[in-house]
């Protein structure tokens, strides 16, 4: 989800409408235009490397994603590359105390916290979705992961003391309301 002045938004770039190069270019341009905080579950170990290798394949550029203070001095101490900074929060890595032995599956933690989890899906289906060009199934699967990550992130903010219980509940309800409006 994207959270800004207009509220919560969830949108996807699907190969049903765009090429892989267009999807990657749109995604990477967000870092140059908006400088968002990136929240992921295992994003440092899996998602970002895959995205970046595919971006290299397509000859794309992502200067803001790699900037460690050369372009923007504020990124010297808060950038996307350093796992201990907060420009990119890999919630799985943080909750594992940056120790790979403690990594947990998104589905397990989502279900443990009472969130939907993967609803019977798994990442093992992804190659088949791509091979058979089942873009809607792939998009739905990825959006489910994004929503579970968002809900876990909200719970993490509560754990950290950055959200009060009533604020946490408001965000959960706002997310549910948003999803109901979209369906």
Predicted regions and their residues:
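Metal-dependent phosphoesterase core characteristic of DEDDh/y 3'-5' exonuclease domains
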Residues: 1-17, 35-140, 144-167, 178, ...
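Short, basic/hydrophobic alpha-helical segments
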Residues: 20-34
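Glycine/proline-rich loop-helix segments at beta-alpha junctions forming the active-site rim
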Residues: 172
